[in-house]
């Protein structure tokens, strides 16, 4: 074959047309509704829910079944919570597939302890650490976002292109932070940059002044913070600013969230914060998603929103292609519907896709966040976007070459 908040989410988890009696097909959603990415999760969930809405409004799955999307809170930082949430979806909710998780550690825990043993395909829209690629997953774990091996290289080259040739780095001590820091430092130093100090820090602490003191002792004014904007990342930046230690703050996707702006403030970040995040290239699929998201009143600009829509829509296409709500066969069907050649399907074009699949015509989904040609590890290529804070808002400064 070819290749917002937890309560709101739970209350809205059944997306079905009222009064319909068809059986439901369950696709679960695992996200960090509480914890260090609690402001990042709702827009991703909303985008996935929008994809489910499009499927349900245009005939549903298979013989008219509606998709139901039960949720699970991984907390992002607690492997036990992630495992338990995934176990409930796999063994109690009996989902056919899972969107998520979002944080890398949560995805790995959920996969190893529930999804892989249960034969359930997971598609993460946000787990970026290289460690996901190394899972012994029986071809069950995919992602619609590029690996941090890609983003770390792009961030390093972005700084060097700006003439920032010496930095200090602090990263959150988990799979996400370590993977991103390793990729960044390796490329930055290999291409002529100097990392004067590189320190891990633990998440969810109230005080990082000791680490900041060590970093500032180098005399380097440019601080790279590879962490979460809802927890350690915002505290590190705020305390660095209060002490006058640094003049430039640099981050990655975990920092490009509303919690950083809300809790640190534009007076600190305006014209002094730059970052990278996975971006959505200018394609017919991404343009279509902007229209659909705006019509639905959700943010198309939120980090990982496009990837969340694609994870949900791709899983629906795979189930339709597979011809049943059984778990077996979803993975090869996912590879089939996501890759060329085939009749192009854009976001929202469920009715068209359903008719083509029924006719035995090959399809190729071109998504909200770009093309998703999964490699042998379930990874996708992608683009990285430069971000900055201007007038109290995150703004895109364009796409970066790797």
Name the predicted role of every residue range:
Residues 17-23:
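Sec/Tat signal peptide C-region and signal peptidase I cleavage site
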Residues 2-10, 23-402:
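Extracytosolic ligand-binding ectodomains
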């Amino acid at each position: 074959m070819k290749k917002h908040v937890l309560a709101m989410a739970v209350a809205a988890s059944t997306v079905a047309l009222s009064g319909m009696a068809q059986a439901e097909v369950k696709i679960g959603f695992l996200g960090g509704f509480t914890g260090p990415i609690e402001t990042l999760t709702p827009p991703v969930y909303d985008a996935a829910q929008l994809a489910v809405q499009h499927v349900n409004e245009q005939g549903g799955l298979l013989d008219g079944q509606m998709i139901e999307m039960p949720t699970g809170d991984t907390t992002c930082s607690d492997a036990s919570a992630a495992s338990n949430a995934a176990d409930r979806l796999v063994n109690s909710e009996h989902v056919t597939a899972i969107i998520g998780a979002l944080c890398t550690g949560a995805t790995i825990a959920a996969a190893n302890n529930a999804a892989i043993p249960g034969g359930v395909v997971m598609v993460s829209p946000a787990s970026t650490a290289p460690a996901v690629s190394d899972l012994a997953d029986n071809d069950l774990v995919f992602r619609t976002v590029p690996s941090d091996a890609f983003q770390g290289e792009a961030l390093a080259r972005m700084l060097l292109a700006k003439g920032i040739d010496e930095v200090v780095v602090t990263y959150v001590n988990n799979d996400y932070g370590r993977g991103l820091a390793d990729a960044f430092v390796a490329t930055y130093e290999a291409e002529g940059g100097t990392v004067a100090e590189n320190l891990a820090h633990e998440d969810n602490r109230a005080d990082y002044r000791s680490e900041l003191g060590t970093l500032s002792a180098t005399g380097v004014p440019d601080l790279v913070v590879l962490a979460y904007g809802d927890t350690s990342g915002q505290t590190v930046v705020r305390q660095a600013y209060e002490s006058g230690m640094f003049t430039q703050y640099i981050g990655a996707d975990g920092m490009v969230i509303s919690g950083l702006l809300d809790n640190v403030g534009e007076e600190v970040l305006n014209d002094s914060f730059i970052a990278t995040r996975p971006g959505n290239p200018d394609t017919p699929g991404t343009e279509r998603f902007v229209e659909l998201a705006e019509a639905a009143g959700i943010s198309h600009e939120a980090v990982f929103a496009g990837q969340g829509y694609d994870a949900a829509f791709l899983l629906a296409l795979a189930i339709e292609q597979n011809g049943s709500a059984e778990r077996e066969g979803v993975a090869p069907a996912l590879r089939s519907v996501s890759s060329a050649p085939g009749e192009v399907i854009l976001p929202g074009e469920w009715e068209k896709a359903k008719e083509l699949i029924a006719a035995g015509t090959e399809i190729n989904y071109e998504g909200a966040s770009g093309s998703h040609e999964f490699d042998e590890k379930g990874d996708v290529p992608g683009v990285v976007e430069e971000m900055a804070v201007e007038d109290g808002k995150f703004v895109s400064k364009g796409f970066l070459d790797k």
